[in-house]
Amino acid sequence: MFYFRGCGRWVAASFTKLQFPLARLSSDSTAPRTPHFDVIVIGGGHAGTEAATAAARCGSRTLLLTHRVDTIGQMSCNPSFGGIGKGHLMREVDALDGLCSRICDQSGVHYKVLNRRKGPAVWGLRAQIDRKLYKQNMQKEILNTPLLTVQEGAVEDLILTEPEPEHTGKCRVSGVVLVDGSTVYAESVILTTGTFLRGIIVIGLETHPAGRLGDQPSIGLAQTLEKLGFVVGRLKTGTPPRIAKESINFSILNKHTPDNPSIPFSFTNETVWIKPEDQLPCYLTHTNPRVDEIVLKNLHLNSHVKETTRGPRYCPSIESKVLRFPNRLHQVWLEPEGMDSDLIYPQGLSMTLPAELQEKMITCIRGLEKAKVIQPGYGVQYDYLDPRQITPSLETHLVQRLFFAGQINGTTGYEEAAAQGVIAGINASLRVSRKPPFVVSRTEGYIGVLIDDLTTLGTSEPYRMFTSRVEFRLSLRPDNADSRLTLRGYKDAGCVSQQRYERACWMKSSLEEGISVLKSIEFSSSKWKKLIPEASISTSRSLPVRALDVLKYEEVDMDSLAKAVPEPLKKYTKCRELAERLKIEATYESVLFHQLQEIKGVQQDEALQLPKDLDYLTIRDVSLSHEVREKLHFSRPQTIGAASRIPGVTPAAIINLLRFVKTTQRRQAAMNESSKTDQYLCDADRLREREL
């Protein structure tokens, strides 16, 4: 009999007598008969599906626990993926062999690259997604993933045991307790609870306990986390009403067609499943003063707006927009929900007014005069955990082998959740096999920026990814996510397939070869002008001009360059992606050199590790103010670089910490050298004894 300390109670269990509480849907014929897994993932949303499949790809026997299997892959809010900053996350998730990008390519009904007026480093790939197709394709993928078992069930509590002495944390998670009292054991547990922790839905003055419309919240688990000592906050979000397509007058609205050709999210796909000519348009309309009037006259009927709980700054409700920006017109994008769906999603009209007032407001808008509301908009309020309580691997400081991913960490958006899910799944698996964590730094990816911001700065409002948050965005582009992460994912995490790894290696070597060839081809400027007349090349240049420099001109691409110099450039035009990436590399060549130097400087700071067991409150070897000590104690940064980004930690404190780290490293090196010398002398003594 083994005993585990639960939240304020003792949980007793015998490993030999455990019975599995419910029949499970398994894609793994080798799933254990006893309920013991390597990794348990709680929640089947966008973070949970990525976490579960990532852990399984890494070789861990994984259990995905969800309230309902038929809601796996459900897009609870907007029917779209990607956007500015978010599209970068999608490419990075795909580079680590995640699911959502490939599923989007199979399910998209309208593809558009945003930010085209700017450089390719900040282009944002976005797609409208068929909700029904996405859910079907995701469930098919999940239920056919080796080593992954899916089970319906709600988690009420965590099973805890004594901590591992070599790691920080006051206890260790070793399983979960379901609402029916049954238990399942695991080496690592990942919480991806979304908006379900003590979630409530708000419409007007009415509130209902729910994580989303039609699904029950998670109460017991929220209480467990609070009793364990986690700092819990409260956030809110919302979704707009759904409108009947047939009731909208599209003929008077501004029509927006998809890009042709469509750019896929996944590096493994050359095209998307639904051809551009078969894709659906979106339409644009605007609010007007009558909308403002309805909002302002009925604030007393809207408890969600009156709440002090913080909502998403960059996806506000229409009520928030009217209050913050009075007398302005606001865009409303009418987005299709699927190829055969009768519903339209009015992006920009998230609201929590009473249902009858929602329809009254909508019919004030141009093109929606006869619109019928099929489902009212509603708000959701839910618990989240201060993300400064987790490490860059997404493991919690308080409880060993417990990982958080998704909205539980204070983020908003499918893409942010998916990115965290992949990292949590990888690291939960690596923790089981006692391997070093897989951490993406700020210099390596948008995922690194996302996690670093959360773990060092925390958040008091739903966090959304933007390109403006990234210091090295010229290097961290959507086109090169595979070069940055796929090779690492294969070698350091084991989460990338052999086929994807080989493709990334081929692309990397082809790019290096292509750039080398382009640098080697040189002609006079006048000759280049004759070869490519459309290029605005100045003929007054006296020095030879490289083909790589010619490719920098906006009018020139690899096709026109290959026509001018067929050999050896023609072969680089056969792969469209390779040709486009060579163009991008040429565009940024001069600035990338300087940015790489800056990255090296940052990496040096990141390489200076702070001792994991450092007690900032009592340490005497470093001069720190009481305020700085408290901030460092709460956030527990792992590197000097991370410590420098914590608000309130002064440059003087960083210098003192830097001195402390270097002194500690010198002492450790001296001790290691002394130990080697002692070992050498001992070996010499033994050798002499044998000779005698």
From Swiss-Prot:
It catalyses: 5,10-methylenetetrahydrofolate + uridine(34) in tRNA + taurine + GTP + A + H2O = 5-taurinomethyluridine(34) in tRNA + 7,8-dihydrofolate + GDP + AH2 + phosphate + H(+). Residues 1-25 form a transit peptide. InterPro entries: FAD/NAD-bd_sf, GIDA_C_N, MnmG, MnmG-rel, MnmG-rel_CS, MnmG_C, MnmG_C_subdom, MnmG_C_subdom_sf. Disulfide bonds: none annotated. FAD binds at residues 43-48, 155, 218, 407. GO terms for cellular component: cytosol; mitochondrion. It holds the Pfam family GIDA. Keywords: FAD, Flavoprotein, Methylation, Mitochondrion, Transit peptide, tRNA processing. GO terms for biological process: mitochondrial tRNA wobble uridine modification; tRNA methylation. Homodimer; forms a dimer in the presence of potassium. Interacts with GTPBP3; forms the GTPBP3-MTO1 complex composed of homodimers of GTPBP3 and MTO1. Belongs to the MnmG family. This is 5-taurinomethyluridine-[tRNA] synthase subunit MTO1, mitochondrial. It comes from Pongo abelii.
